C-alpha cells in the first residue's frame, strides 16, 4: 500500500507532529509499504529519507508562529494526483479538510489525524464565549468526520470532542524512540540532590500560549520562595520567548537555544531531577513522554492528555504554581521515582503505534474493496 501523508503545521523546528510523521513513515516502510509525505518548505524540493519520499511545497508563512501553510488546492491536487497513493493520511482538520473529498472521488481511503483539541483552542485562543466555541468546534469536527473515512486521535482527551457528537474516533497513542531517549545513568541509584546540591528542573513544551509555559516560570518562583535551591532549563522556542525571558528575570531559569541533534537534547534533558509539563491542551504530550523515557519523573497538569501519558511516572496537579511546586517536592521524596518514570514510558512504542495505524488503513481498504 502506498500511503501519502500530508501535514501543514510542520517546520524545521516543530516537535511532536514532525516526530510522529517520521516514526510512522519509517515503520510503514519497514512493514513493506510505501510512504510519501507532503509538508511546507521554503521552496519546491523532493528528498528521499528514511520515512520515504518527502515533497516540500512552497508555503505562506504565518507571522509569529514559525509555521507556513500550503494554500494552493490546485497545485496540491495536481501533486497528489502525480504521487497516486492508495491511501492518504492528513494531519490537519482545517486547512486541508478538502483532501478527504479528493480521496473519495478517487476511490482511495482517507484518514484524518486530530493532533489538536479544537474545543480547547476555540475557548482559550479566541474571544468566542464557551458555548458558541463548543458549537463551532462541533461543526468543524462533524464536517471532518463526514469528509474522511476514519478519524484518529492520539489520546482519549483528543477523541472526546468527537465522541460527544457520536463520531467514532480511533485512539492511537504515539510512541518514543528508545534508542535515543534512554537513561544516561543508573536509575536504581539515582537519588534526590543532597543538601547543598542544586535541584535541576527541565520544562517540557513549546513556548506558545496554548502550552501555558508561564506556569513553569511561576512554579520556579514558588520553589525559590520556599527556600529550595533550584534551576530550570527551558529548551526550545516559540512566540512567547521574549515575554518569558522578561518574566523569569532574577529567577534561576536558563533559556537554551533550539537543539537540532536529538541525542544531544536527550543527554541534556536526561540530566534533570524533575520535569514540568504544563500544557493544558496537549492531545498527547510527546516531549513529556520523551523525558519520562530518560527516567525523569514529571509534574503535569490535570487538564488535557498529559495525565494519560504521565500516569504513574509522575504527579498530576492542578494548573497553579503552588500545586506544581508541591508536585516537584513530592517527586523529590518519592522512592524509585526515576525507575517508575522509565517504566511508564515503556508502555508507548512506535512499533505498536504504527501497527495500529496500518490496521486502520487496511480496514478502510477492505471496506472500499467489498
Stretches found by the model and what they are:
Residues 255, 311-322, 329-335:
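Conserved acidic donor-binding segment of nucleotide-sugar-dependent glycosyltransferases
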Residues 4, 192-221:
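Conserved donor-binding/catalytic core segment of Leloir-type glycosyltransferases
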Residues 258, 267-272:
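Short alpha-helical donor nucleotide-sugar binding micro-motif in glycosyltransferases
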Residues 280:
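Aromatic "clamp/platform" in nucleotide-sugar-dependent glycosyltransferases that forms part
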Residues 242-263:
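Nucleotide-activated donor-binding/catalytic signature segment of Leloir-type glycosyltransferases, i.e.
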Residues 293, 297-300:
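Short hydrophobic beta-strand element within catalytic cores of glycosyltransferases
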Residues 157, 175:
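Carbohydrate-associated surface elements
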Residues 109, 120-143:
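Nucleotide-sugar donor phosphate/pyrophosphate-binding loop at the beta->alpha transition
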